[in-house]
């Protein structure tokens, strides 16, 4: 299972919705893959980030950090070759990352 497949599986485990993957090789100098996922509340967004980080560590994937824990309307988890954006619906609609990377 690739890292992208692993991440999507773990986000699905905690009922993440509207999960999309973008191959951003050649478009981004910091990563190869971007995954965006929606959570219904700050609690769910935090839980998905916590679970993803814990499961990645268990599986031997290195985590390079996270941002956004303070507000939990948008948490970014850096897995090196894959960056994961876990967002509440309002934040996702406001920032429209899909338009940026599609």
Model-derived regions, located:
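Positively charged, small/polar-rich N-terminal and surface patches that mediate targeting and assembly
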Residues: 1-34, 38-102
């Amino acid at each position: 299972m690739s890292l992208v497949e692993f991440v999507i599986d773990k986000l699905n485990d905690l009922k993440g919705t509207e999960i999309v993957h973008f191959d951003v090789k050649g478009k981004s100098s910091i990563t190869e893959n971007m995954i965006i996922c929606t959570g219904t509340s700050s609690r769910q967004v935090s839980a998905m980030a916590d679970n993803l980080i814990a499961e990645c560590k268990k599986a031997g994937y290195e985590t390079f950090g996270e941002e956004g824990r303070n507000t939990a309307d948008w948490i970014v988890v850096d897995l090196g070759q894959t960056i994961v954006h876990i967002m509440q619906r309002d934040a996702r609609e406001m920032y429209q990352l899909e338009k940026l990377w599609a």
